[in-house]
Design a protein with these regions (language model features):
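A structural signal for multi-pass alpha-helical bundles of membrane permease subunits
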Residues: 1-207
């Protein structure tokens, strides 16, 4: 369960940061037809309660694609996050365009500008988005409960809940599992605390 949770949370976090940073950079620093419409469509998806799309998504993933009890069913629906795109777009709007223009003058490609200039400058915001995404999927419960039925494919939170039924509420293993599930989050926060606090103040006015 711990390994499953680590795989799912890590892959989803890396994917959302990768796609979110590219989309955020394009929406913040690039001018192209329909940019504002795309951004407002993105915002509108954040207003839709997840319960509205849950049943169609479940039918698509488990019945149409046959991804029940697989890593694909746990990972693919969360590969892109509109919240991450929105947050990174807002953070990248504060980055000075002069640095990117200077890199282009020095014959840097657009990929080089994104990789060597934008990502290092946006590291605090990326850290915050990464922490929120990782924690959210580390503690995810409802979707893994729906798409997994085999014990070998369960995630940590679903596995802990199953102690009530499979082991007649074994409080000892449950408490031990709860502590184990909390430890990685605590370690990650203290390891990235400096970037996390910087990211929370992105866009703030400094006197």
């Amino acid at each position: 369960w711990l390994v499953n949770t680590l795989i799912v949370a890590s892959v989803v976090t890396i994917s959302t940061l990768f796609f979110g940073s590219m989309a955020g950079y394009a929406l913040a620093k690039k001018k192209f037809p329909g940019r504002d419409k795309i951004f407002w469509m993105l915002l509108s998806t954040m207003m839709i309660p997840p319960q509205v799309t849950l049943i169609p998504l479940y039918i698509l993933v488990t019945m149409k694609l046959g991804w029940g009890d697989t890593y694909l069913g746990l990972i693919v629906p969360s590969l892109v996050s509109s919240w991450t795109i929105f947050m990174l777009k807002q953070a990248m709007q504060t980055l000075p365009s002069s640095l990117m223009d200077a890199a282009r003058i020095d014959a840097c490609t657009e990929w080089g500008v994104y990789w060597k200039v934008v990502l290092p400058l946006a590291r605090p915001a990326l850290t915050v988005a990464g922490i929120f995404n990782f924690v959210g999927h580390w503690h995810s419960f409802f979707w893994p409960l729906l798409v997994t039925s085999k014990s070998s494919m369960r995630l940590l939170q679903v596995g802990l809940a199953s102690f009530r039924f499979e082991n007649a509420t074994s409080y000892g293993p449950m408490m031990a599992g709860a502590v184990i599930s909390a430890l990685p989050i605590i370690v990650m926060f203290f390891a990235l605390q400096r970037f996390f606090l910087q990211g929370l103040t992105v866009g703030a006015i400094k006197g």
